[in-house]
Design a protein with these regions (language model features):
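Alpha-helical transmembrane segments in inner-membrane proteins
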Residues: 1-335
Length: 335
């Protein structure tokens, strides 16, 4: 790698980190009540004796921290799924993984009476895992194996079917499922440090597994035969990457609800400026994903003031045309 490329990637990382700090500051300052920089500093540094503005900032801190964590996790999950399937359209939402996790939680609430975050995570991971395996199996049928188009179609069809099942379960239980219906929109409001701490171990494990698989996934981009020739165990690499992606997505979905398109948009933005090497794409996507989610959440609060629009709805509104652009630009070819 040339010193120019190395220097450029360092500059990109510094720029992304700076953008993330700006997004975090905007998340703390904007909303139904805008606060000043001095109030942000006071709200972050004080433990008591808050002014009204500082109190608002203090209450927004868990939301902003969770936005950072969830954005990183979803972007890394999308990056890993794109690498595992060699599909530029792969994303936890497009492949139906988010919807599978949501359906599992609905079933758990309606029929098994689950209520704790740990139970939510267990059901979300189960639903995400089963859906990921099912979509990949369906997409692998027929001539050519698991092509990008077939995986996207299988994921979209599966997501639509699972969404209808979610609605079928929700409709007769309008009163008891009101809280879940709000959760289903996908958002980071109402996050607490306790909830973040509960999902943090799974996210750390998923991120560690993804980082361990980066070298082999880079080789996998050359094709299975070439990767095998380089000594890569393709089946194990795909399994490791898939498990990491499901852990990252499932844990985040359990607390935030299904937030789509973050895992699709962030990796593509990063590849445009940093190239295809996953050693750089994965960490930069995490930073970009956190920035995008915080911007979506902040925009939802500003546009919907004095109420708010959930971040999942904003990201879907922005991400849908980007999906069309990516499909047209790449002609849906494999990575």
């Amino acid at each position: 790698m040339s010193s120019w490329n190395h220097g450029r990637r360092c500059l990109v990382f510094i720029a992304c980190a700076g953008l993330l700090l700006i997004c975090a500051a905007l998340s703390l300052s904007l909303g139904s009540r805008q606060v000043t920089l001095a109030e942000i500093i006071g709200g972050v540094t004080k433990n008591a004796g808050f002014t009204m503005g500082e109190l608002v900032v203090h209450q927004r801190i868990p939301r902003t921290v969770f936005g950072l964590v969830a954005g990183c996790a979803l972007a890394m999950s999308g990056t890993l799924m794109q690498a595992v399937t060699r599909n530029p359209l792969a994303d936890p939402g497009i492949l139906g993984v988010n919807t599978g996790a949501a359906l599992a939680i609905v079933v758990g609430i309606a029929f098994f009476g689950i209520g704790s975050l740990v139970q939510y995570m267990a059901f979300a991971l189960l639903g995400a895992s089963v859906t990921a395996v099912f979509v990949y199996a369906v997409g692998s049928l027929g001539y050519g194996g698991a092509t990008p188009v077939k995986l996207a179609l299988a994921g979209t069809a599966t997501s639509a079917a699972l969404s209808s099942l979610v609605s079928l379960i929700l409709l007769p239980r309008s009163t008891s499922m009101d809280a879940f219906r709000f959760w289903q929109s996908g958002g980071i409001g109402g996050a607490t440090f306790g909830g973040i701490a509960s999902i943090a171990p799974l996210i750390v494990i998923g991120a560690a597994l993804g980082i361990c698989a980066v070298g082999s996934l880079n080789a996998l981009a050359l094709g299975d035969d070439a990767a095998a020739g380089l000594g890569v165990k393709t089946a194990r690499t795909r399994l490791l990457g898939a498990v990491a992606g499901v852990l990252l997505c499932g844990a985040t979905t359990a607390l935030a609800g299904p937030i789509g398109f973050i895992g699709l948009v962030a990796p593509h933005i990063v590849r445009l400026i940093a190239g295809p090497d996953l050693r750089y794409v994965l960490p930069l996507s995490a930073v970009a994903g956190a920035s995008v989610l915080l911007l979506a959440d902040t925009a939802g609060r500003v546009i919907g003031s004095p109420g708010e629009i959930e971040a999942g709805l904003v990201s879907a509104f922005v991400g849908a045309p980007i999906l069309v652009f990516i499909a047209v630009r790449s002609k849906v070819r494999a990575l």
